[in-house]
Regions:
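The right-handed parallel beta-helix/beta-solenoid scaffold, focusing on the short coil/turn
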Residues: 51, 69, 77-79, 86, ...
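Small/polar beta-strand repeat architecture
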Residues: 168-212, 354-399, 407
Length: 599
């Protein structure tokens, strides 16, 4: 039998243990009604080195005083922010959501973020005056006026998805008519396109806003985690990571927001631009279990950036890059490409620093750029001025995208420019330009070609059907492409290398299903092509591509086809494999792709 005193002591100890257990589960619980109040309390918790913060469930609503984002969190380390049941509602569409800078091992969990006022607009096209190059658009109730110049997208009123077979609509001036009706003057090249694309009185239109900011940003961060977060009505990207050591983890949903106040129609889009965007990270991101839909641009782009070579001799290079953006450090690998995007050489950086002379190229803005010098570990071949310099070590190498759903959006499901990546078990459906493209983009200054990719067990369905890519002059001939950024000028080394495309399903895709260009050591094995070429398609025909072929290979070496099959092909499939110029060692061209006989 326990004495009363001992019993009280035991109960007291148990209470301490329970309290301690609670403290370990949530060191601090904070309440807030506005973003300003929440920001102050989170920074105070970080200053006090609190490891776990629980935000009390509820709606935190308002703008941001003296900053561009509702929350700006800098320098946090080893901190968990549990926001389950919390809604962060922005009232100013020009403000971003959560911005984390220079953070290490920070977890944000359970938050719902959205803009109450959409950072875009939408309505119905009433008519088109071809002589005046002017659309007349009635903006839906509850949505803002269109910006003075931007880009719009046509939507099918029945499916409320991007209208098939049309171009984006670029415009440069807006006139207020009456009520919610506006005149929108389109660019000079648009009237001829709209003659065939537009159905006045029926077509819906969504128009990008230009004043918004990122929903969630990880800037120069490392080892951070975004878990069970939902984003709606994003101002630019849903999630952005920029620079830093990287290795961040993402599990989130980007989807359509609620109807704004006074509206009678649901939003047509979920974000103004990309669902996710990674640029300049040393270690690539991991995206797992994400649902990304309704965005106006790519779902998952991963890249670094180029520098411009101004002079080269022996082991020394001079190059120009943006101010405060010299990404090349000793020990990093570098790759060089000629002005026509052909691979020239690779090496390792020994030393780098500011150039001892200022080249001052007259066509480049001196106030935004800095000239640097670099010494490599080996002699380089002749490198022409205007060549591009990149490193795979700041392009998100080692990225993983697994078990994600990407659907019903403009542009590309994946836009990959990184090495050592894994893309597996994803569903990509309704991407208007392509399900996946691996390519550098010299015009956007985004690097580079990819090496050592594995793309397996994914489903690509109903992609490459709008945004101009169905036209004969399309610059994207394939619904799935590993390619150069421009038509190749001939072999001078291969950009893409060692890529495995295994066990994927390509379903309901018209035109060329797969395009391989500027590639070496590629394996295409065990893929299924279901119901291809059911409808006529001229995608890329005017540029010399054959959209009647299932797969097109050009400028390639050591490409292997094995155990790929075509099921229920449509009447417009005329050729399984077309082999273009500058190819060698193509294995399985005869029996590596076969049409499966119906039982």
């Amino acid at each position: 039998m326990i004495a009363p005193f001992c019993k009280r002591l035991l109960l007291s100890c148990l209470a301490v243990l329970v309290t301690a257990g609670t403290a370990l589960a949530a060191d601090v619980t904070i309440t807030a009604k506005t973003p300003d109040e929440l920001q102050q309390k989170l920074l105070e918790a970080a200053k006090n080195k609190v490891k776990k913060v629980r935000i009390a469930p509820g709606v935190i609503r308002g703008g941001a005083t003296g900053r561009d984002h509702l929350l700006f969190l800098k320098g946090l380390q080893d901190m968990e922010i549990d926001a389950a049941g919390v809604t962060l509602a922005g009232t100013d569409p020009t403000k971003g959501g959560v911005f984390l800078r220079d953070c290490r091992r920070v977890t944000l969990r359970g938050l719902l973020y959205y803009n109450e006022v959409p950072p875009f607009t939408q309505g119905r096209v009433l008519k088109f005056d071809e002589k005046q190059s002017t659309l007349e658009v009635e903006i839906d109730a509850g949505y803002p006026a269109p910006d003075a110049d931007s880009v719009g997208y046509l939507f099918d009123p029945e499916t409320r998805r991007w209208k098939p077979g049309v171009y984006d609509i670029y415009y440069n001036k807006v006139f207020k008519r009456s009520g919610r009706v506006y005149g929108i003057r389109v660019n000079a090249d648009m009237p001829a396109k709209l003659k065939t694309d537009l159905t006045p009185g029926r077509d819906l239109i969504a128009i990008r806003g230009k004043q918004g900011k990122m929903a969630i940003t990880f800037d120069v961060c490392e080892g951070c985690r975004l878990e069970k977060v939902t984003i709606k009505s994003a101002g630019v990207f849903g999630v952005q990571e920029s620079g830093g050591n990287g290795g961040n983890y993402y599990n989130y949903t980007l989807t359509y927001g609620p109807r704004p106040k006074g509206a009678s129609s649901d939003p047509l889009i979920s974000s103004v631009a990309d669902a996710f965007h990674s640029g300049g990270a040393l270690k690539g991101p991991t995206l797992e279990g994400c649902v990304l839909e309704g965005m106006c641009d790519d779902a998952v782009p991963i890249h670094s950036s180029y520098a411009l070579v101004v002079q080269a001799a022996g082991r020394k290079l001079y190059y120009v890059a943006r101010r405060n953006a010299n990404q090349f450090k000793p020990g990093m690998r570098i790759r060089l490409f000629d002005p026509e995007q052909r691979f020239l050489a690779e090496a390792v950086v020994k030393t780098t620093g500011k150039a001892e002379r200022d080249f001052r190229l007259p066509h480049l803005p001196a106030d935004k750029l800095v000239y640097y010098r670099l010494e490599s570990d080996r002699d380089l071949p002749v490198i022409p001025a205007g060549a591009r310099l990149s490193t795979p070590d700041t392009a998100g190498r080692g990225f993983v995208v697994r078990n994600c759903v990407i659907r019903n959006h403009r542009a590309r499901g994946f836009l990959i420019k990184a090495d050592d990546g894994l893309i597996e078990n994803n569903l990509v459906e309704g991407s208007t330009i392509a399900g996946l493209i691996a390519t550098p983009q010299f015009g956007w200054n985004e690097s580079c070609y990819s090496r050592n990719l594995t793309i397996r067990n994914n489903i690509f369905r109903n992609t490459a059907y709008s945004t101009g890519v169905t036209k004969p002059d399309s610059y994207v001939p394939g619904a799935f492409s590993i390619k150069s950024d421009a038509p190749s000028k001939g072999p001078a080394g291969y950009g893409h290398r060692n890529i495995r495309i295994i066990g994927n399903t390509f379903e309901n895709q018209d035109g060329m299903n797969m395009h391989l260009d500027n590639v070496q050591d590629i394996l295409i094995e065990g893929n299924r092509f279901i119901r291809p070429h059911r409808n006529p398609c001229d995608r890329g025909r005017a540029r010399g591509y054959n959209p009647d072929a299932l797969i097109f290979v050009d400028n390639a070496e050591r490409v292997t086809f094995r155990d790929n099959r075509v099921e229920a092909p449509g009447p417009y499939l005329k050729k399984l494999l077309e082999i273009g110029k500058n190819t060698a060692d193509i294995t399985g061209a005869g029996d590596g792709i076969v049409i499966q006989k119906e039982r």
